[in-house]
């Protein structure tokens, strides 16, 4: 196929799609140019079905540093493991694509997005999401798309689609919404305490824009799309299925209705073991033994899936006996750990998270050096999910995509209420340790994080709580669930996480397993989530009503002063000589940023105060009209030079020493003498003139005698 080009104007920028020129051996490939961002997307599919019990979809988002005209860091000077942002973007693309493959599809699919050029004002992640859907749609891979995604900002009461970097900086909302032509199927958002009404409007505005992109994709697919390949889907033997349902469904139904998680798992496992044992014995010598046993396991999974959903939709019974809008028992505790800077333990049913706060100087802030300009990240929220939290063994090692994603969600939810750097000059790290999990552990980590921040004396604007909402839908009827547990997440259609304060929403995240949900469901889920959020905030308030007025004794003491940017070099000195001398003298640690914010860190408050005085003296400038207690440092015939402070001298001209005539400066002043002077002039070269006589009373003028007539 020769090169073909398609283009449209979207959100004020040219969107260009090129096919048929590069990566032609992939099942489908496109080059997407949006503004000056360029992304190559290639989609490939294995020829055979994989043997696993899940759909092996892999989505990558690769940031090439040359795209921004930068060298990679590190010794090897080449790209290494994906950055956190790249990992989050890969997840962002994976989530709306995954539901668009048929049930039982097991061929391995890889979608590789490579950022070739980067424009911070034209979203490369959204170009990659568009390219991922389009590469799959024009290929022979059986993908039930297209989908598309957009970013939405909210500035001065107006919604902006795919904002520029400057617009996003001014926005009260950072929202990514994706979906099909019919409905939304993925949401990721951080917000500055916005109402449910504004968030819902933003979602709908975003979906309108999504539909524009889908229409463009459909035009391209009509023009160049390949015929879809015939692939084998994982399907069970219907006769075997009917037999197992007839003989074992009643026992499995009873097991599913056991309310306590561990007991329910034991009961369902016991039923499954009986069934599996029965068929293992029956078909041990059968030539299709492996296929039959795979079918048995899949049938049992389908039976459990169907029963959980039937109980909720028909009988309104949840696995643990709760009402559809009922939260599990809650408990909140602070100061769980000694020595640390702050800690909070939050428990919701059988889900429990411990959050631990650490404060440090801004020098410990994380330096982010990606495609965007380098910056310092002040707040970090890390999420750990050990396998013991679900009573299992498993892999231990570096954080995976799920842990990175859950940590980022908590970070977005909590960073909206953090104090400004000027008010609280600390780098802040929260670590959430999931100690038990039966669903919604990411939201428990947000609640525990609020407790740890408040217990540690971080003056947050308001407490934040999070709740996970679920959905069971049969296409006609649906049930929205509050505070979903693991089984409801696993067998349900939606995981919709909502975090916020009493004033509004600070974070949203939605993943679904069906092709989309309606505005009505979104509105109902947001309303139920608000009610639940307020209940949880009441419990957090019971543990700690407001942030402590003081930091923990173990927390570092940090003070901050602001200096003019042109004075930074004065404080640092030649080769760092001045700042090194201050540190050696006071024993503190000093961090200075490019905006002139000076952070002083020490366990000794007196040392901090001494350092502030030294720096204030270094950057101090003489001002006309101010009085200084000065020391004479040099005497000349025309006057005396006096030191006002540090390295700032002034000239007291001979005529400014006294109101009476001074014949000889040396007769009046001597080196080392201390005198009070007033600054009367500073010229354009910074030279200072001072006066002694300006501080002395002016003698009265002598009366001239009248002439006699």
Curated annotation (Swiss-Prot):
Q: Binding positions for Mg(2+)?
A: 489, 495
- CC annotations in GO: cytosol
For biological process, the GO terms are:
mRNA catabolic process; RNA processing
Q: Which Pfam families has this protein been placed in?
A: KH_1, PNPase, RNase_PH, RNase_PH_C, S1
Cell compartment(s), UniProt: Cytoplasm
Q: Where is the S1 motif domain?
A: 625-693
**At the top level of its lineage, which domain of life is listed?**
Bacteria
- Give an example GO molecular function: polyribonucleotide nucleotidyltransferase activity
Q: Which residues form the KH domain?
A: 556-615
The Swiss-Prot or TrEMBL record lists the needed cofactor(s) as: Mg(2+)
**Subcellular location, principal:** cytoplasm
CDD domains on file? KH-I_PNPase (cd02393), RNase_PH_PNPase_1 (cd11363), RNase_PH_PNPase_2 (cd11364)
Q: Which reaction does it catalyse?
A: RNA(n+1) + phosphate = RNA(n) + a ribonucleoside 5'-diphosphate
Function of the protein = Involved in mRNA degradation. Catalyzes the phosphorolysis of single-stranded polyribonucleotides processively in the 3'- to 5'-direction.
Q: Which family does it belong to?
A: Belongs to the polyribonucleotide nucleotidyltransferase family.
From the Swiss-Prot or TrEMBL record, give the protein name.
Polyribonucleotide nucleotidyltransferase
This chain's source organism reads Streptococcus agalactiae serotype V (strain ATCC BAA-611 / 2603 V/R)
From the UniProt record, report the name of the gene that encodes this protein: pnp
């Amino acid at each position: 196929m020769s090169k073909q080009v398609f283009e449209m104007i979207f959100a004020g920028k040219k969107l260009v799609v090129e096919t048929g020129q590069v990566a032609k051996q992939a099942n489908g490939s496109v080059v997407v140019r949006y503004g000056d961002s360029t992304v190559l997307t290639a989609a490939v599919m294995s020829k055979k079905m994989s043997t696993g019990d899940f759909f092996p979809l892999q989505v990558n988002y690769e940031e090439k540093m040359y795209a921004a005209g930068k060298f990679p860091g590190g010794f090897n000077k080449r790209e290494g493991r994906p950055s956190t942002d790249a990992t989050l973007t890969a997840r962002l693309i994976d989530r709306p694509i995954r539901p668009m493959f048929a049930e039982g599809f097991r061929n391995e699919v890889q979608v590789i997005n490579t950022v070739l050029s980067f424009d911070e004002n034209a979203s490369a992640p959204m170009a990659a999401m568009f390219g991922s859907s389009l590469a799959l749609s024009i290929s022979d891979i059986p993908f039930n798309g297209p989908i598309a995604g957009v970013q939405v900002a909210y500035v001065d009461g107006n919604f902006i689609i795919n904002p520029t970097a400057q617009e996003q900086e001014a926005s009260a909302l950072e929202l990514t919404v994706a979906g099909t032509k019919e409905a939304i199927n993925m949401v990721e958002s951080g917000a500055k305490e916005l109402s449910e009404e504004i968030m819902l409007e933003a979602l709908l505005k975003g979906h309108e824009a999504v539909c524009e992109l889908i229409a463009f994709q459909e035009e391209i697919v009509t023009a160049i799309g390949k015929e879809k390949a015939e692939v084998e889907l994982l399907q069970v033997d219907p006769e075997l299925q009917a037999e197992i349902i007839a003989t074992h469904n009643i026992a499995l139904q009873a097991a599913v209705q056991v309310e306590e998680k561990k007991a329910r798992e034991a009961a369902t496992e016991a039923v499954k073991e009986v069934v599996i044992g029965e068929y293992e014995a029956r078909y041990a010598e059968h030539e299709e033994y492996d296929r039959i046993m795979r079918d048995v396991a899949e049938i049992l999974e389908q039976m459990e899936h169907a029963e959980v959903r039937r109980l909720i939709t028909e009988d309104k019974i949840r696995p643990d006996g709760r009402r559809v809008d009922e939260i599990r028992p809650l408990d909140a505790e602070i100061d769980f750990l000694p020595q640390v800077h702050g800690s909070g333990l939050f428990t919701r049913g059988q889900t429990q998270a411990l959050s631990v706060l650490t404060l440090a100087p801004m020098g410990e802030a994380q330096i982010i050096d990606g495609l965007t300009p380098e910056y310092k990240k002040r707040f970090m929220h890390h999420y750990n999910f050990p396998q013991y939290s679900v009573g299992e063994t498993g892999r231990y090692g570096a954080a995976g995509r799920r842990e990175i994603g859950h940590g980022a969600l908590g970070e977005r939810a909590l960073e909206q209420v953090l104090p400004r750097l000027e008010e609280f000059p600390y780098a802040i790290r929260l670590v959430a340790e999931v100690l038990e999990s039966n669903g919604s552990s990411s939201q428990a980590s947000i609640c525990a994080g609020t407790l740890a921040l408040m217990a540690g004396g971080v003056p947050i604007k308001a407490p934040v709580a999070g709740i996970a909402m679920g959905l069971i839908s049969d296409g006609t009827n649906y049930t929205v669930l509050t505070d979903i547990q693991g089984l409801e997440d696993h067998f349900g259609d939606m995981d919709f996480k909502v975090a916020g304060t009493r004033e509004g929403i600070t974070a949203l995240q939605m993943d679904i397993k069906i092709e989309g949900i309606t505005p009505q469901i979104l509105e109902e889920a947001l309303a139920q989530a608000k009610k639940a959020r307020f209940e949880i905030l009441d419990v957090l308030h019971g543990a700690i009503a407001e942030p402590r007025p003081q930091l923990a004794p173990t927390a570092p003491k940090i003070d901050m002063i602001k200096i003019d940017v042109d004075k930074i070099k004065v404080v640092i000195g030649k080769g760092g000589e001045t700042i090194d001398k201050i540190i050696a003298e006071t024993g503190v640690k000093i961090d200075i940023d490019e905006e002139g914010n000076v952070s002083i860190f020490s366990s000794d408050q007196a040392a901090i105060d001494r350092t502030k005085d030294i720096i204030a003296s270094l950057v101090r400038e003489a001002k006309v009209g101010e009085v200084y207690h000065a020391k004479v440092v040099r005497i000349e015939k025309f006057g005396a030079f006096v030191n006002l402070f540090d390295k700032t001298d002034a000239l007291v001209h001979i005529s400014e020493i006294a109101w009476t005539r001074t014949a000889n400066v040396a007769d009046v002043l001597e080196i080392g003498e201390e005198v009070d002077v007033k600054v009367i002039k500073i010229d354009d070269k910074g030279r200072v003139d001072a006066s002694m006589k300006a501080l002395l009373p002016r003698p009265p003028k002598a009366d001239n005698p009248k002439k006699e007539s």
